[in-house]
Amino acid sequence: MWLGEAIANWTGLTTEGVRQDAPFYTDDDWGLDQNLDWKMDDVIDFVLQDPWLSDDDTDIEYVYLYLMDQHHTALLSSEQIAAGWREHINDWIWVSNRRARDLMELGALPPVTGMGTLNPDYLQIDAQLTTELFGAIAPGMPDAALRLANLPILTTAGGYAAHAAQFYVLLYALASEVDSTQPRREQIVWLVNQARQYIPDTSKTADIADFVLTDYLANPDVNDWERTRDAVYERYHQHASDYGFIYQDWTESSVNFASGLIALLYGEGDFRRTVQIGSLTGWDSDNGTATMGGLLGLLYGYDQLAAAFPDAVLSDRYQSHRTRPTMPDYLPEDSSAEDTFTLMAERILPLVEQTILQAGGIVDGDVWTLPAAASSQPLTLNPLFQLYQQSVNNQILQAGGTLEVNVVGEVAASRTRGIADGLEHNFSGQERTRRLPQAYQRLVTDGELVVSVVYDRTVRVHTIRLIEGSVGGTAIRAEGLMGDDWQPLTDGTVISTSPDPAVPYQVFDIVLPEPVELSGIRVHIESSGRLPEVSVLELDAFFDGAF
């Protein structure tokens, strides 16, 4: 996996960001000397290194591996992720990764760091190139893979960008389930179809996957991958608004997700061809290429990868200190590398076995028996879709209903529109056409801020979620609207975390001892300190049942 990812990453870097718009590359450009002073390798050709240099397509996953190894768990917490980023991920990061890291510097934790209100780059590519590893740690267990990858994905992504990252995680998790007796073309199509089942039909990511796969299957010429790339350019970039979409820029999730799928499908399991196509598709061309190179390495193994380069000796060494100088040196006697892919694989194996055991499987020496596959529909196993389906704000809005937001003492209703817009829990994956709201902020001079959301129907609520930030520290009291009366929700309720004035935004889950029928929720947020300012991103509830 790591070797395939590294070859594809550095080959793709020869073209990264060069063609951000038409005219794009074609097969005829392979071997072209671009004469670009700002590229380490400006000839479009396979790049082989010794040692392999770290880059953001491998080094954030590399840090995650270190954190999992150190904490002896593949299920990292918000605190573990943020601490690891602050210690090891400081430079060589861009777009959403940079935004998330800056928020962490202020004390914010995932998933807040990937929420659109605070991170306007949440629909960029970042999570797609930093989380595939979690799929490899859960072979044949896509539901477990999604659970492990959930917080790492939400660290930098939301909406359909989070779905694209999930899709890649699923490809890696499902690689072990491919029928090796089938032709490679059929194996790849099967993988894409299986991963697609976990993504909601409403998502832009689903639209892209369906569009690319359909065009590939309808194309009589497997070498004419440019046809599909150009169709992607037309639909999601050049005339995106004609199709109800928005093109962000060359580092966005969407066109680069499409490029990765084009390389995977038209490459038909051939490593060299897959990397060639990925490198020539355009936009941020190293990212999806690296993902698919790693996938084929995982799927077909080292011997097949080595056979693709019969005249080369493929290095096993990895120089992590190029971009991550605070990481451990596992090769103190090697002056130019700090790790090897072999050692990295050895650190992954215990995590794989732990994941299998925790999922109910069996580990007997070198034999792994995976747990029985979940009988549920794949989409229902997606933790992001589960969150969206249980969000009262989102489901009422999706059903065409109404929500009434009130902040005591606030006369400008436009300032409160983001409090119950559902953005922080909206994982339908639909294109967002409205401008992102700002967090509601208020200097609380009378001791407390009172915020309510009233529904147009009664809902069976089991949890109230407040995403809030306060300079001076807070105390929170919750109430529910029962009939015409607001009733306190105190007996037996548990708040998931304690207010911390050092954390700019926190997620508070107020868990009720049992579900309660409510037609509204209200919170009293008490703030203290020299500057008692309170910020509110979202006030939502999670429900049992269906609308």
Specify the residue positions occupied by each region the protein language model found.
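Predominantly extracellular/luminal regions of secreted and cell-surface proteins
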Residues: 390-430
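Acidic, carboxylate-rich catalytic segments that either coordinate divalent cations
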Residues: 206, 214-240, 245-246, 299-393
